[in-house]
Each structure stands twice: as structure tokens, then as C-alpha cells.
Swiss-Prot record:
Keywords: Disulfide bond, Glycosyltransferase, Nucleotidyltransferase, Secreted, Signal, Transferase. Monomer. GDP binds at residues 111-114, 132-134, 159, 162. InterPro entries: Pierisin-like_dom, ScARP-like. It comes from Streptomyces coelicolor (strain ATCC BAA-471 / A3(2) / M145). NADH binds at residues 81-85, 98. Optimum temperature is 30 degrees Celsius. This is Guanine-specific ADP-ribosyl transferase. Changing residue 159 to A: No ADP-ribosylation of GDP.
Amino acid sequence: MITTSLRRRTAAAVLSLSAVLATTAATAPGAAPAPSAAPAKAAPACPQFDDRTKAAADRGVDVDRITPEPVWRTTCGTLYRSDSRGPQVVFEEGFHAKDVQNGQYDVEKYVLVNQPSPYVSTSYDHDLYKTWYKSGYNYYVDAPGGIDVNKTIGDTHKWADQVEVAFPGGIQRKYIIGVCPVDRQTKTEIMSDCESNPHYQPWH
């Protein structure tokens, strides 16, 4: 558990390096912090958007067709996706759903049977890549919204332990933080080869 947590923190540090440098560069050197008479305010809650497809790579997706009534994710934590495509493709194209027109819009049917759908799957679980290690890459995603699958259809289905967040219409490239390749022999991320996405745009 300690090793897993350490690797997760290391990957996050690698992928966040550019953001840290940008923040440092924006701070005037030698500037003293202004005194504050009032206590510091708490950090703002995760931004919420009326547009349920704000993250979508394909805006043609029709959320009104989604059944059952979806429970939308309202948190801002990092999500993860195992994928066989390398960053040279994903960083340029983002993640596109297989079929936003005629695919399976019913969330439960989509989850239980692998079939063309308007969704792109991600997970709350960083370590899920160890199950799908043959895919080769573990992508880090920072996108608004998405459907919390277990809260939508319950957590007793056979794939509940994947703690999935499904994105209707996929995920635009600007919401992908970066990627770590996976060693298929050891089922671990190759930390020295993690890459940050140059198109990533922090939004909160």
C-alpha cells in the first residue's frame, strides 16, 4: 500500500511539473505577502456546469437519451483510463466515443455488455490499470462532470469494483493531464517515461 501510494504521488508530481513551474514563474521574486486582517477563505468547491457535455470531444451526443436518470459526478479529483493508444494520438485527438448516434445509451446495458456506445470510460481507481495492463498506457484525466456509474445503476453489478465514471461524447484533449506507460511484465507504471500533455488546460 505504501509503495502504491508513493508511485501514485510520484506520477502526479511528474505530470504536474509544468503547472508547478508556471505557478512559480508567475510569482514575483522577492515579493512579500500582503498582510491580511481577515482569516483566509476556504478553497472554492469544485466548479459545476449546466452543460453536461462540457468535457465532450463529440458535441453531437444527446444526453436526453441517457437512461436511467444519470447521477452526475460533482467532484474534481483525477480520473484514470487504460488505453492501448499512445500519447501521440490521444494528446492530439482526445478520447472519442465509438458511436454517439446509434450506440447504447442505456448505462446499465452499456456497462454489462461491451458494445458501441456514446460513452468513454474512466475510473476513480488509479490502480485499475493493473487489471488492464495489456493496454499499455495509464492516462490521467481532469475533466468536469461525467456519469457516476455505480450511483446511477447501483454497486451490485459485476463491474462495480471498477468505480467507473462514463463521459457521454468522450473527453476533449485539453482535459487529459498526461500519461504513464505500463510495464506489462511488472504491471507497474514506468515513471521515467511519464509524459505531460501539452494541450492540457487546468480549469479549477
